[in-house]
Amino acid sequence: MGPLVIYTDGACSGNPGPGGWAWATAPDGEPHGAGGEARTTNQRMEVFAVLDALRTHASLADEHGGPMPIEIVSDSTYVVNCFRDKWWVKWERNGWQNSKKQAVANVDLWKPLIELVRTTNVTFRWVKGHSGDRMNDLVDRLAVAAVPR
């Protein structure tokens, strides 16, 4: 059995401004989750979507009782590169400062997300946004719909 594939996205009307996040499981989009904040950033919504998706699914077990493999698919290079290129390891080592010696943005979301990634069998895959990927288009619509009006 392959991994549980979860698509995630974040949206923001203005940056900062009101924003929304969403996730949905492939192949049909169910289950899914979404929410929003009155004042946020697009990057923050991208990270929150992944955090909520993993909080919802991390306790699932595979057929052998181990952690179910999960693949997060995102159009956010910010999220995907953090894990693919291990940015988070450097952030921790450098006291939560980025390569420019500035405080890492959204550390309040990154820390719990990194803890979940450490204890979950999860991989990350980037997908080009607005490229006709049906599931990416779905989570984009859900995230936009979740933006507070």
What are the roles of these predicted feature ranges?
Residues 116, 139, 143-148:
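A two-mode feature
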Residues 1-44, 55-57, 144-145, 149:
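RNase H-like nuclease fold core
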